[in-house]
Amino acid sequence: MDYYSEIKQELINNEVYKKVKDYSKNKSDLTTYYNVGKLLVEAQGGEERAKYGEGIIREYSKKLMMELDKKYSYRNLMSMRKYYLIFRNEKVHAMRS
């Protein structure tokens, strides 16, 4: 038995697994950001520059930070909204499934 080869293969398999896992997580995050951004734009009446909509996002942010996690700040929700606006006409939305 070639122990070195066995050990090396185990380590390679682990690295491949981690990369696949990271890709899946990243894809899931991007899909979530796209979908949240879309919902935020829809909540603002579909307007790209809805002034009153900033209040909606601030309100949602406060609630989400209290109920879920601090990472859902106004700034992060605005970034998700911008992400959607940038990619809404691209094939990125095909990732939603």
Residue spans of the language-model regions?
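Basic, low-complexity intrinsically disordered segments
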Residues: M1-S97
